From Swiss-Prot:
Protein name according to UniProt: RNA pyrophosphohydrolase
EC number: 3.6.1.-
Organism annotation: Haemophilus ducreyi (strain 35000HP / ATCC 700724)
Keywords from the UniProt entry: Hydrolase
Described function: Accelerates the degradation of transcripts by removing pyrophosphate from the 5'-end of triphosphorylated RNA, leading to a more labile monophosphorylated state that can stimulate subsequent ribonuclease cleavage.
Top-rank taxon: Bacteria
InterPro entries found in the cross-reference section: Nudix_hydrolase, NUDIX_hydrolase-like_dom_sf, NUDIX_hydrolase_CS, NUDIX_hydrolase_dom, RppH
Nudix hydrolase domain: residues covered: 6-150
Length: 197
């Protein structure tokens, strides 16, 4: 499906782990790395397309991830002339317009499976630092990646802070509970201490 301007509607997916690293995947048979992405089928809504692509490309399902954010706007990139297919039977696709999703992996990373389809998109993956993809992706996608990661950085920072706050609250609560128990133990021990005559 290609729009009137020659752009193919597409979803892009950034998957992060609990320490803020992102999943970086190597295109099958190439030394080219990128985030999972794929086209939106005719009549398919954007979120459905994202979950379909998530499964097709990295073998994850809705239960394996938590949706943290979806970009509000379409971001576009043009393909270099050498990659533009000029097939007379189909409209010319000059690039992609994408809506991006930020997901957090909640399952174990062993759930990632690059072989769920007969024609895998990727043949390897790894965790990388959050900003690494902006510098490493092919040049014609770099501007889109920069915009996406800027938008997602604020969301992920809030998630990290929220997680740290929750951990701090739990740790403080555990510490208070420990102190209460120790105080009760001391009081009981003092009560059982023989009084002098």
């Amino acid at each position: 499906m290609i729009d009137f301007d020659g752009y193919r509607p597409n979803v892009g997916i950034v998957i992060c782990n609990k320490v803020g690293q992102v999943l970086w995947a190597r295109r099958f048979g190439q030394n080219s790395w990128q985030f999972p992405q794929g086209g939106i089928n005719e009549g398919e809504n954007i979120e459905t397309a994202m979950y379909r692509e998530l499964y097709e490309e990295v073998g994850l399902t809705k239960k394996d991830v938590r949706l943290l954010w979806a970009s509000k706007y379409w971001l576009k990139y043009k393909l270099p002339k050498r990659l533009v297919r000029n097939d007379a039977s189909q409209p010319v696709c000059i690039g992609q317009k994408q809506r991006w999703f930020l997901l957090q992996l909640v399952s174990d990373e062993s759930a990632v499976n690059l072989k769920t389809t007969k024609s895998p998109e990727f043949d390897g993956w790894r965790w990388v630092s959050f900003w690494y993809p902006v510098r490493q992706v092919v040049s014609f996608k770099r501007d889109v990646y920069r915009k996406v990661m800027r938008e997602f950085a604020a969301i992920l920072l809030n998630e990290t802070r929220k997680g740290e706050t929750e951990r701090s609250v739990l740790e403080a609560s555990d510490k208070r509970e420990y102190q209460r128990r120790e105080t009760r133990k001391s009081a009981r021990a003092w009560n059982h201490y023989p009084k002098g005559k």
